[in-house]
Amino acid sequence: YDNTLKQNCYRLLRLVNNLVDMTKIDSGYMKLIFINCEIVSLVEDITLSIIPYVESKNINIVFDTYIEELEIRCDPESMERVILNLLSNAIKFTNNDGNISVIVEADDKYVFIRVKDDGIGISKDIREDIFNRFVQEDKSLNRKNEGSGIGLALVKSLVELHDGEVYLEDVSEGSEFVVKLPNIKINEEVNNHNRVMDVESKPLVQKINIEFSDIYELY
């Protein structure tokens, strides 16, 4: 009972957080704190932190990159939410014994964060609308993959606030979401100032509990 109550509280908190943030974005009050962030470590740490969860669902997850270190202008708090949301979606639609891979690539202009899975994929009729609000892949009344339908819309908005874009690759199996961010840094004076402004964030495990709160099975 206690676990059910806690999970439902996390679900409600996730919904409220998403609605509040979408309202802030719509009204122009969503302010990000940009610093020079080590993006490879950020994505790797998030990926590794969810291994115990995906293993409990018999899903294999791997992180891969050829980049050792790379700092870019980024708001770590919002980028964590972006990556966790994409991973949450990948887990929802990946069957037991499935595979998820997270890949970081870069060229002179952009950084690419790829979240790939070999799950059921996304039907062609909603691919163009998948980042719109309240669009869900599973629309059945007895759907087992619950959600508010605003997660990917929020992902799109947060990435665009980074002057980036998020899109869905055309793959033959599963799905592949790509976050494309400018490969730029801010000057050190602004970076140091923003690091002082950056407030202490929630522990990563709590963020995972919130973002993954709607992954469950209905029997």
Where are these regions (language model features)?
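Conserved catalytic submotifs in the C-terminal HATPase_c
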Residues: 33-38, 55, 60-70
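Short alpha-helical segment of the dimerization/phosphotransfer core of two-component systems
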Residues: 7-12
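Conserved glycine-rich
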Residues: 59, 163-164
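Short conserved segment of the HATPase_c
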Residues: 122-136
